[in-house]
């Protein structure tokens, strides 16, 4: 219900003509960034970039969740804590976009805040289970779920082809692929 209300608020604040397609942007701005096609054990992408590079909203949306505390421990290795500092938004396309291992989250970024494509959400880092690794942005694309459903939040489709398109200035939407992943999961 909360997510529906957030979408309604977003729609009222930022009305978009019915024919206008969402605009997508690459989630790391003003820095050299590289990434592979596949993640090590589930659908996501690690975008390698220098610490402090801007993590930006890839689409207009509403902030869903923010984690400002890095409580991950290698001893317990709890999945819900692996992302360290993180931000997830629900895009105007109804898809969740998740960035984690951040070194910093921007002041004012909080659940319910409306963001625009390209707006800085935080900075690339190595928090959570990335502690001790090269800085990178873990980037996941998924469908919205109940709070705390970290296995979905971290990613359900491989983002690389969308990242390739967005980096080239093209608006390739992951909506159909996310809907298919959700249906395949029986959700």
Per-region residue spans from a language model:
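Sec-dependent N-terminal signal peptides
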Residues: 4-13
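Histidine-centered active-site/metal-ligand motif
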Residues: 39-42, 91, 101, 136-138
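A residue-level detector for short acidic-glycine micro-motifs
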Residues: 65, 101-104, 123-126
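Surface-exposed, glycine-biased beta-strand/turn segments
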Residues: 17-86, 92, 117, 126, ...
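Active-site loop architecture of trypsin-fold serine endopeptidases
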Residues: 72-78, 124-138, 144
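Short peripheral tails and domain-boundary helices/loops at the edges of structured domains
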Residues: 140-169
